[in-house]
Design a protein with these regions (language model features):
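The catalytic-center signature of Zn2+-dependent metalloproteases
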Residues: 28-47, 112-167
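Short pre-active-site segment immediately N-terminal to the catalytic Zn-binding motif
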Residues: 2, 98-118
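Extracytoplasmic/secreted envelope proteins and their assembly/folding machinery
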Residues: 5-8, 111, 115, 119, ...
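Extended catalytic-interface subdomain
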Residues: 60, 66-74, 82, 115-126, ...
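Sec-exported extracytoplasmic/periplasmic mature domains
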Residues: 9-20, 123-124, 128, 148, ...
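Conserved catalytic/binding loops enriched for acidic/polar residues
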Residues: 137-446
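Fold-level signature of zinc-dependent metallopeptidase catalytic domains
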Residues: 1-34
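Active-site-adjacent "gating/activation" loops or surface patches in catalytic cores
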Residues: 48-53, 57-104
Length: 446
């Protein structure tokens, strides 16, 4: 409850930036008040057994769209999921006397995310949309979807502190100032807001909306703006993918039975392994936007913004190299030390969509895990929209790569060579996934 209230109160920073001191308050609702009462803005805490969304809704006057009541629904599932993510990152459960300390570290990681989530959903009730460019602008808004910014210290240890940002962002302040600012008598409100907009543009803050960050489903190559992606970090999506792959290598090397508490079924190690093994998946999507990518703005005539600029050939080649590195057998392989820790699920515990698919019945399947990760990368590289964009960009600038240029590199890089025997099976599996994705591309009707 405390974390939820603290996160919601971050909006007072934006309200005060608009000139209203202590103008945003969050208090516990009296027990005798109906949370559906339209006179009260409400945050409700709900429980859910599986993963799902939280919501920032509002009741509006249909005539004017004035917000009459904000109603936020936050799900407890987020605490459980972030706890699980942290367990996989640091495998914290060592000796019995260290378990309480580990739980404190995991709890703070999860609560930091709840603060951010609370602020995010309250932002929606204030009428503020997502801004998926914020993570590329130094985490400039709580209205992005933040990926935990986990780092390595100088000794190579995983650092969870600072994984989620604290406080309202500069973009959020600008949005509140534009939307809620009152103007002195004699000042034209349209002119005042136009001045606010000019100041915001001059600050360099960027904006990418929902419809240009997640077109279609998760496997489609919707986003084209390298800054406008979900669950990514950093101003350079390719550099961040390389950094995240190095971090992932350390996480998987350290993965052990210490990732679950004593007394839990060893088979549940797979639950913890899945988000750790696939921790790079969203950054792969972000790096893929560089291929055939364009930086663009929602420019208005006369406002001075650059409408569109294609990503350079050098940056596109770097993106392809980084994505192909995620397909290396060394990156896809799980050590036998990890695989041998995971037995079949206990009776009646069952399997779910939260686990890797498998071709081995009830036995853990490391090849299926590798295939899942390979498909994430190859589906992005071989999407029909990305293919069309790359061909289009070369028509405009012959120095930029076409889809055929990229495909030649992908195919020639993927056919297996002689390798360590432990990695041969994976080296052979990746071209199979490649051919499958090529078949899907060929089946697409233009």
């Amino acid at each position: 409850k405390t974390a939820l209230i603290e996160g919601a109160l971050w909006w007072n920073q934006a309200i005060e930036a608009a000139g209203y001191i202590n103008g945003f308050q969050v208090k516990v609702l009296p027990e005798d008040v109906d949370p559906m009462d339209v006179r009260y803005n409400v945050i409700q805490w709900v429980h859910r057994s599986t993963r799902g969304w939280s919501y920032g809704s509002s009741v509006r006057d249909p005539r004017t769209q004035e917000i009459l009541k904000g109603h936020v629904t936050l799900g407890s599932l987020r605490v459980r999921q972030d706890y699980l993510i942290a367990e996989g990152l640091i495998a914290p459960y060592g000796e019995d006397d260290s378990i309480d300390e580990a739980k404190d570290k995991l709890s703070e990681f999860a609560l930091a995310r709840i603060r951010q989530l609370s602020a995010h959903e309250v932002g929606h009730t204030l009428g503020i949309a997502h801004n998926f460019a914020a993570s590329a602008d130094g985490r400039a808004s709580v209205m992005d979807y933040p990926h935990p910014l986990v780092t390595l210290d100088d000794s190579g240890e995983i650092v969870l502190e600072g994984a989620d940002d604290v406080g309202i962002g500069d973009w959020d302040k600008r949005a509140v100032i534009w939307g809620y600012q009152d103007f002195p008598d004699g000042t034209s409100a349209p002119e005042g807001r136009e001045a606010i907009m000019r100041e915001t543009l001059a600050s360099g803050l960027r904006y990418v909306a929902d419809e240009h960050a997640r077109i279609g489903n998760r496997s489609s190559a919707g986003p084209v703006h390298p800054a406008g992606c979900l669950w990514d970090n950093g101003s350079d999506p390719v550099a961040e993918l390389n950094r995240l792959m190095a971090l992932r290598k350390v996480v998987l090397a350290n993965f052990s039975e210490r990732a679950i508490q004593p007394g839990r079924a060893m088979a549940t190690l797979e639950d913890v392994l899945v988000p750790a093994y696939l921790m790079h998946r969203y950054q792969v999507e972000a790096a893929a936007t560089v291929l055939g990518g364009q930086t663009f703005t929602y420019a208005m005539r006369g406002d001075g913004q650059t409408t569109m600029q294609r990503v350079s050939a050098k940056e596109q080649r770097a993106a392809l190299s980084a994505m192909l590195a995620t397909l290396e057998p060394e990156a896809l392989a799980l050590s036998d030390a990890v695989v041998s820790l995971i037995p079949p699920r206990p009776p009646q515990s069952g399997v779910s969509r939260e686990l890797f698919p498998r071709h081995t019945g009830y036995v853990f399947d490391p090849m299926a895990a590798a295939g899942t990760a390979a498909k994430i990368t190859l589906a992005q590289l071989l999407d029909h929209k990305r293919a069309a964009r790359m061909n289009s960009q070369q028509l405009a600038d012959p120095g930029l790569p076409s889809f055929a240029d990229m495909l030649s590199i992908v195919i020639n890089d993927r056919w297996p060579e002689a390798r360590d025997a432990r990695l041969v099976a994976i080296a052979r599996m990746v071209p199979v996934v490649l051919v499958d994705e090529l078949a899907s591309l060929l089946a697409h009707k233009a």
